[in-house]
Amino acid sequence: MKVRASVKKICDKCKVIHRRGVVRVICENSKHKQRQG
């Protein structure tokens, strides 16, 4: 899980989702997991 100021899709399988006001990226590749902090 990377915590970043700006979250972006890294590959085609990444999905940007909003969960309780937190922007997250979920992906099959666990290295691509991000959250906005």
Curated annotation (Swiss-Prot):
<keyword id="KW-0687">Ribonucleoprotein</keyword>
<protein>
    <recommendedName>
        <fullName>Large ribosomal subunit protein bL36</fullName>
    </recommendedName>
</protein>
<dbReference type="GO" id="GO:0005737">
    <property type="term" value="C:cytoplasm"/>
</dbReference>
<keyword id="KW-0689">Ribosomal protein</keyword>
<dbReference type="GO" id="GO:0005840">
    <property type="term" value="C:ribosome"/>
</dbReference>
<dbReference type="Pfam" id="PF00444">
    <property type="entry name" value="Ribosomal_L36"/>
</dbReference>
<dbReference type="InterPro" id="IPR000473">
    <property type="entry name" value="Ribosomal_bL36"/>
</dbReference>
<dbReference type="GO" id="GO:0003735">
    <property type="term" value="F:structural constituent of ribosome"/>
</dbReference>
<comment type="similarity">
    <text>Belongs to the bacterial ribosomal protein bL36 family.</text>
</comment>
<dbReference type="GO" id="GO:1990904">
    <property type="term" value="C:ribonucleoprotein complex"/>
</dbReference>
<dbReference type="GO" id="GO:0006412">
    <property type="term" value="P:translation"/>
</dbReference>
<dbReference type="InterPro" id="IPR035977">
    <property type="entry name" value="Ribosomal_bL36_sp"/>
</dbReference>
